[in-house]
Amino acid sequence: MNRKLLLVFLVVAMLVMQPAEAGFWSKIKDFAKKAWNSPLANELKSKALNAAKNFVSEKIGATPSEAGQIPFDEFMDVLYS
């Protein structure tokens, strides 16, 4: 096969596949966006946030508002000790 013909074939294939792949990835992105903003996902995110806050408050022995007043270095020392 001639090199120039192979190059033309590859360029045409790239031009044809690029819109097809773009449509495929946009559908995946739309589905992920709908799933992320769904009521179930919002409920799970809020539960995870509350669990993280409770873990930190139990670990450092302070309420979340008190934990906000602790300097970062002391906060990290308490978490990893």
From Swiss-Prot:
A GO cellular component entry from the record: membrane
InterPro entries, A to Z: Antimicrobial_7
Keyword annotations from UniProtKB, A to Z: Antibiotic, Antimicrobial, Cytolysis, Fungicide, Hemolysis, Ion transport, Membrane, Secreted, Signal, Target cell membrane, Target membrane, Transmembrane, Transport
Subcellular location: Secreted; Target cell membrane
UniProt keyword Manganese, yes or no: no
Matches recorded under Pfam families: Antimicrobial_7
Domain of life: Eukaryota
Protein's UniProt keywords contain tRNA-binding: no
GO process annotations (BP): defense response to bacterium; defense response to fungus; hemolysis in another organism; monoatomic ion transport
Signal peptide (UniProt feature, chain positions): 1-22
Transmembrane regions listed in the UniProt entry: none
Tissues with expression: Expressed by the venom gland.
Propeptide residues, chain positions: 66-81
Biological role stated in the UniProt entry: At high concentrations, acts as a pore former in cellular membranes and causes the leakage of the cells. At submicromolar concentrations, degranulates granulocytes and has a weak hemolytic activity against human erythrocytes. Also strongly inhibits the production of superoxide anions. Has a strong antibacterial activity against Gram-negative bacteria but is less active against Gram-positive bacteria. Also has antifungal activity.
Family: Belongs to the non-disulfide-bridged peptide (NDBP) superfamily. Long chain multifunctional peptide (group 2) family.
Protein name (database record): Probable antimicrobial peptide Con13
Species assigned in the record: Opisthacanthus cayaporum
Classification of source organism: Eukaryota, Metazoa, Ecdysozoa, Arthropoda, Chelicerata
